[in-house]
């Protein structure tokens, strides 16, 4: 399926989804939100895809935010619907069951940071700028920013960044736990690709179990998380990949996980 605002390509078991609106700094409009939901659902259903990289076209921005020219025309009910569409799309990424890496160069602001936060890992260029500046427009973050920022960076930092709207650099974002790694701009693609390849070579059942267990524990508490962890652990023992992993360890070789 072709998209108006996205580029989709595969490199082995890694799928790369690129938001391709560089003239708008990859701003999220309703059409792009809908296309992202479709593209990630396709990646979820494709067994050949084991890891996903989410990127923005050009070097100026991952995503500079929502499309303000579109937002300015919305009625209150349309704005609420747009918020829910974005929230549902990002929940779908968070709950995909396959690891998603956000490649952050330039600006990741507003809806862009919200999109990055629903990804499981975030690799940032040293030149990246991150923030939730919605307060300067007279609105609240609408795509989950108030919830995920507090979970990732803590309540105090979330309040500071949302109440002031002041962007931060990649170094501070890393110190807050908001990004996974910070690298020189010229090393960003190599770092992202290496991590994606590492994840794609892992056992898919175990990857999904880890992603789901951490999410469930975070949303429902440690007891629910531990219960799901035990079930996921047991389920792994029904897979050929578990037998391959243990045998490879005993034979001192690299495992070849097939997803079975």
Q: What does each of the following model-derived ranges do?
A:
Residues 1-55, 77, 91, 189:
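Conserved CoA-thioester-binding segment of acyl-CoA-metabolizing enzymes
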Residues 1-3, 247-260:
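Terminal low-complexity tails and localization/encapsulation signals of metabolic enzymes
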Residues 17, 21, 35-36, 54, ...:
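Terminal peptide-recognition signature
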Residues 22-25, 60, 65, 71, ...:
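A short, glycine- and basic residue-enriched loop/turn
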Residues 56-92, 108, 221:
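Glycine- (often His-adjacent) and acidic-residue-rich active-site loop
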Residues 92-207, 235-239, 243-244, 253, ...:
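Crotonase-fold acyl-CoA enzyme core
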